């Protein structure tokens, strides 16, 4: 890690937008605070996070948990993404990393293209979402992020 002291403590840095007037410092501080929180959820490997980097994580972080639960239930039925085996989750994440490119994903996973297609078809049968279709891929990606957010929020509820 970039910032690690002798006491084994991790240091995380977050910052908001640059401001020109003193009255805007409060807003930038709130943005930095949010960047720190959202960074813990969606940017685990990063020690420095900017508010401008948060993307859709910033929106998900502000969703009420009951709405998240309803969304996940609609997308996955009674299932949870945790029910998927590690192989399919690795496949999905790699597929997203490669911008839904079947050939490049299969190459990076060291599997035949047809094996990847089979896995995607299998996922489509269980979820109704075809990750090769952009809209379905977005829905699935957001659902995975929402699940990650809900898990994080559960750890805060002692």
Residue map of PLM features:
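Cytosolic nucleotide-utilizing catalytic cores of signal-transduction proteins
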Residues: 1-158
